[in-house]
Amino acid sequence: MPNIKSAKKRVRVSEKRRLRNKAYKTFFKNRIKEVLKAIENKEPKEVVLELTRKAQAAIDKAVSKRVIHKNQGARRKARLFEKVNEYLRTLETTQE
């Protein structure tokens, strides 16, 4: 445990930030999981696209709050869109 007053404050502040960052990370990870689960359950196109928009917004918010690096956010979105686009292509081929 720190003895100096400023060090004690740094411990309090960093713990508060850690919890806030954890909440943002959990939020956007759950949004991504919702999209992947919708793809797995073969949900309609509109549902998947709506969930994808929400996931994208959650990732962008985490990037803007500096919870994750912008490149990590871009990478996560790219991988998610890759899976969504693949699913949408399979939907189109099955409809024909």
Curated annotation (Swiss-Prot):
Annotated GO CC locations: cytosol; small ribosomal subunit
GO molecular function: small ribosomal subunit rRNA binding; structural constituent of ribosome
One of the GO BP terms on file: translation
InterPro entries, sorted: Ribosomal_bS20 (IPR002583), Ribosomal_bS20_sf (IPR036510)
Gene3D superfamilies: Ribosomal protein S20
Stretches of the chain forming a coiled coil according to its record: none
Entry annotated with the keyword RNA-binding: yes
Domain of life: Bacteria
Keywords, sorted A to Z: Ribonucleoprotein, Ribosomal protein, RNA-binding, rRNA-binding
Signal peptide per UniProt: none
Protein family membership: Belongs to the bacterial ribosomal protein bS20 family.
Function: Binds directly to 16S ribosomal RNA.
Protein name from the UniProt record: Small ribosomal subunit protein bS20
